[in-house]
Each structure stands twice: as C-alpha cells, then as structure tokens.
C-alpha cells in the first residue's frame, strides 16, 4: 500500500519530527501501518475521516495554519484545545504551515511528495487557486490519492458555497423530518453529516488504496455534507415517489412501524422497536394488555402504523405503573427489543461499554485523561488502540503576512 515515491520514510519522519517527536508505538499499529497521510483539514468532518485512518494505523500528519485549526476553539475548550479537537485529531502528529509563504509551501509540497494520501477540505475553487486540485496533483504525483471533503460537492453551481453540518441538515431535508409532528424542524442531536461524511471519506480512501495495488495509480476521492445528507434521506425520497405524499415529522416514531419509538413511563422513558405482528403479541402478553392483541385498530402492523397515536395512549397508560429501568429489564427478559433512554455520559459507567472495550483512555484538552469511544470495529477481537493524543499547537505565534 505505501507510496513508492522519491521521498523516503526517513525523509517523512525527519520533517514531522521537527515539530512533534517521533513515538515508539511498536511494530503493529494496525492494518494501515506504513501508509502516510498529509491531513490539510480543519473543523470536524474531514479531520474525523483522517482520524479513522489514523486509528487504523496510518501515519497521519495534521497540518494547521499558524493560528491553529478552528476546531481548537470549539466549546468546551481548555489547555491543549477543545474536546472536539481531541476527538477528531487523536493518533495524529502535527505541524503548522502558512502555505502563502514560499518556504512553507515548499515544505507542504515535500510532504505531499512523500505521502500516499492527501486529505483536504478546502472549497474546490480554493484548491484550484492553490494548485492543490486533483488535476495539478496527479501530474506531479501519479500514485497519490487525493481525498477531498466539501460542503456541497466538487461540481455544480454551489460547489464553492460554505456550509456546516446544521446548514446541510436543513438543505437536504433531514431537519424537516426531525422533531415532533406539531413542532418546528430540528437539527439532529449529533453531527450526523460531519461524522457521516468523514466516514465516507475514509471508506473511499481505503477503496482507493486497494485499487492502487492493482492499477499502480492514485485516484481522486471526494464526498460532501450535501451528498451525505442526500444518502441519509433515501427512505423519504423513495416513499414520496411511491405515495406522492410529502415527508413528515414523526417525533421518535416511524411511519412504517408501530409501536416504534420513545414512550413515557412512571420515571424516565423507554424506546421500543416492534417490527412485526408476532413481536406485538409478545409485547402485549409481557405487559398484561391482552385486550390490545385483538383490537381491530392494532391487528396488523399497517393498522398500528395508521393508529399509532391511539396505540401510544394505550401503552403509556400501562407504562406509567413502573420506571423505565424496570420496564426495560422486564421486557428485555422476554427477548423484546427495548431499552431505557439514557444520557450519553451514562456510557461511562455502562457495563456493556466496559465489556466491549469501546471506550478508551486519551489525554483530554486539559491535559487529564478522559475516555472516549475508539473505532467501533475490532479485528480478530482486538480494537485499534489510541497511541497518542491530539497534537499541541507548537507554532501558534508565528508571524503571518496578513497580521
């Protein structure tokens, strides 16, 4: 997989070590050991994608402007940077360059010459102006894989528009189908487009590395928040074309299944996912509501979906007798797909988190240890480990020609 170009690994490490001391991580870092990545990105989406490559063992160098990646200043922040920056730049080494300065631009060119993958999230027009677009790079480095992530894509009239996760959730219709039926459109509670686009970017790089083994040539990999958002609403697009009806908000429910969603209990909420008639019968028997089994409003999944509001009323009348944890335990024991609604921080003490090893220790923005999710993939039962924290901004006070 690694690029067999003129710049040797020793040259690469020599450049990197001028800013960040090399680390002894052992021989087997992961499946991408030996792959060199130059990461000229900022904010969240593209850095998240290159963090996946780093987790898989790639040697990822995060290149920042002298004033630092904007992600360093995202709240909450302290000390080394922000919580966000710690997450999306883990397992990377770091360097600051002002590529408007000739010397720094030559350094960047040297880094790219020694890389297998070059990751960017500048707008397409800016890449072209800098001579960092795929066409320019391919002429110099035919084996290089250029991976780019933008807001609206590499083509089309809006390719150079700026955009963030929430903006593209609105544009692609995700916000319009999120929230309660009688409420306003809502942004999803996690940055699903940032994380999704970053994941697609990493997947594309892996495919391009595999292809290069056969062709000997690099390729251009691109994705965007817009394209990712479009892919997330595939069901809604298909449903509209089948029924002719506009998409709607259903709260925590689902238009095709019932009961499916979040229900109030005596204390807290539970989430139930019933996708078939046999499971509905099991649920009714488990909660002692035999009358609902033969109720004509709820006899089939289609009936229940059409009458989901009435079904919710009936179920919550029963659920108010116990807490969410009690119901979750009772119904899970019957083999039903149900769980209590938790806070994200509950994962820190969750037994399943502990047993799967999904949470790993890393140095946080305040210099203290914190636990965050590692890569949600294991290889032969082993999860790729965190090898180093996000890099310090080691050259933040360097003068800039525009200061």
Indicate where each model-derived feature is located.
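Glycine-rich beta-alpha junction loops
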Residues: 67, 152-153, 225-230, 267, ...
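Aromatic-enriched alpha-helical interface/lid elements that frame and gate functional surfaces
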Residues: 258-334, 338, 402
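Terminal low-complexity tails and localization/encapsulation signals of metabolic enzymes
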Residues: 17-36, 247, 264, 346-403
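Oxidoreductase and adenylate-handling cofactor-binding alpha/beta cores
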Residues: 198-218, 231-243, 284-290
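Flexible glycine/proline-enriched surface loops and loop-helix/loop-strand junctions
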Residues: 184-193, 264-267, 382-385
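Conserved PLP cofactor-binding pocket of PLP-dependent enzymes
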Residues: 332-353
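N-terminal helix-loop segment corresponding to the beta1-alpha1 unit
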Residues: 4, 10-217, 362-363, 391-392, ...
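Conserved Rossmann-fold dehydrogenase catalytic segment
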Residues: 154, 182-190, 213-229, 245-255, ...
